[in-house]
């Protein structure tokens, strides 16, 4: 859908299958993505635009990426391999950042430094261990993996047998290295450093595959930001906690989350000019796909009456039923109909709810008896109940939570205050990882 909209906006015509295929091949197909595109690295990983970026969902990993400033897929793979409990406990992250800033980790040998050049002198990947075993220790290729397994088993607590195996492998490594021109002390030092890093070495092929997925996300964020935001929000629709976090991230990028609206919402999240995002109908309880199809096919609606009745006075709705309309009223999703407020048909949304939902059957029966009588019945009930007070804030919050699963934080905290918190770098406590200390804000839900 996003591709179709993109092509329509540029060409002013409805795209055919080949138009969509060609656009995809030129812009989104894996072969079209340049993994060396520095604009992507700088826009996302350096500036910290994290909304929906794979491998960068926690504050800790985000901070590490901004410190490490990746410029290649291998850099991303290295960062994600380091950002694990073992390497972090051993301060490998600090060693890596220092190395990126010119304080290279030196093994005392040019051949070793060359093998570890792409990871700034640190042994990060198990594949590097195999290369060291072959090129430095002189192990035949088929024996290299045995060394890797022996070292890994020793490191993860494989018992006495594993320790003995690693020790015997050490002798073989040192002997092979000496045959390759190393003195015994240097060879032993290289092996001991291999042992140190082996507890944290990660599988490179696995890390690179994940890094590519992360880069694809960053690529979409860089070149198709609005569409990426919409896709990200759609993916969060079934999880209220994650959706609240997504809202916070997206607001931090300058976007405004608009209210659901009968005339502007669609089946998917929609981006409007001015960095505005409109929710999908389908992310709200009570509004099914068949109801959405009917809503969209009959738009635009100029007022409430044109939404409920045909020009001849007959009832207009079938799939768009009472439950769906009630959901729209509860989340105040009829603003574009301009029928709620002072000197309007309805004083507030509670008034509208009481009239339309409360007298639904009576209004429909009146319509069946005589076209236009239903409209008159609705107006009469509305005029007779104008003293209806609106829902208080707690009730509005409950309405939204019941329909959406979570409430927009702007219902609790004014947008101006949120903007100041974002500007100062103060996050919601939901965005702070359990093992980290940071300053955050929160709202008290209830006091017993």
Give the ranges of each region predicted by the language model.
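Noncatalytic, beta-rich nucleic-acid-contacting surfaces in large DNA/RNA-processing enzymes
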Residues: 1-448
């Amino acid at each position: 859908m996003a591709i179709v909209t993109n092509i329509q906006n540029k060409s002013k015509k409805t795209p055919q299958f080949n138009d969509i295929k060609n656009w995809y091949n030129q812009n989104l197909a894996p072969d079209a993505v340049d993994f060396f595109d520095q604009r992507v690295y700088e826009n996302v990983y350096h500036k910290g635009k994290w909304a929906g970026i794979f491998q960068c969902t926690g504050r800790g990993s985000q901070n590490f990426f901004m410190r490490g400033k990746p410029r290649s897929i291998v850099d991303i793979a290295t960062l994600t391999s380091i950002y694990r409990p073992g390497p972090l406990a051993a301060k490998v992250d600090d060693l890596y950042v220092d190395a990126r800033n010119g304080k290279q980790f030196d093994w005392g040998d040019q051949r070793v430094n060359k093998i570890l050049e792409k990871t700034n002198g640190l042994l990060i990947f198990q594949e590097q261990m195999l290369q060291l075993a072959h090129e430095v220790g002189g192990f035949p290729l088929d024996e290299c993996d045995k060394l890797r397994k022996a070292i890994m088993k020793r490191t993860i607590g494989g018992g006495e047998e594993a320790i003995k195996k690693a020790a015997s492998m050490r002798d073989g490594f040192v002997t092979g290295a000496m045959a390759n021109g190393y003195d015994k002390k240097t060879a032993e030092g290289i092996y001991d450093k291999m042992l140190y890093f082996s507890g944290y070495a990660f599988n490179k092929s696995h890390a690179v595959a994940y890094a590519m997925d992360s880069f694809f996300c960053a690529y979409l964020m860089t070149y198709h930001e609005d569409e990426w935001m919409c896709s990200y929000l759609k993916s969060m629709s079934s999880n209220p906690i994650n959706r609240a976090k997504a809202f916070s991230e997206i607001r931090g990028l300058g976007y405004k989350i608009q209210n659901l609206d009968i005339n502007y919402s669609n089946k998917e999240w929609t981006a409007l000019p001015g960095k505005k995002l409109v929710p999908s109908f389908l992310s709200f309880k009570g509004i099914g796909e068949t109801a959405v199809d009917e809503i969209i096919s009959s738009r635009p609606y100029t007022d409430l009456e044109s939404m409920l009745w045909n020009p001849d006075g007959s009832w207009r709705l079938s799939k768009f039923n009472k439950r769906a309309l009630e959901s729209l009223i509860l989340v105040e999703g009829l603003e574009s109909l301009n029928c709620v407020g002072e000197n309007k048909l309805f004083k507030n949304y509670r008034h509208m709810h009481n009239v339309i939902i409360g007298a639904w059957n009576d209004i429909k029966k009146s319509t069946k008896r005589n076209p236009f009588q239903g409209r008159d019945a609705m107006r009469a009930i509305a005029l007779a109940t104008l003293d209806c007070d609106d829902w208080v804030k707690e009730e509005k919050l409950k309405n939204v939570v019941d329909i959406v699963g979570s409430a927009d934080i702007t219902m609790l905290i004014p947008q101006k205050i949120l903007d100041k918190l974002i500007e100062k770098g103060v996050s919601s406590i939901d965005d702070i990882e359990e093992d980290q200390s940071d300053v955050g804000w929160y709202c008290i839900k209830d006091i017993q």
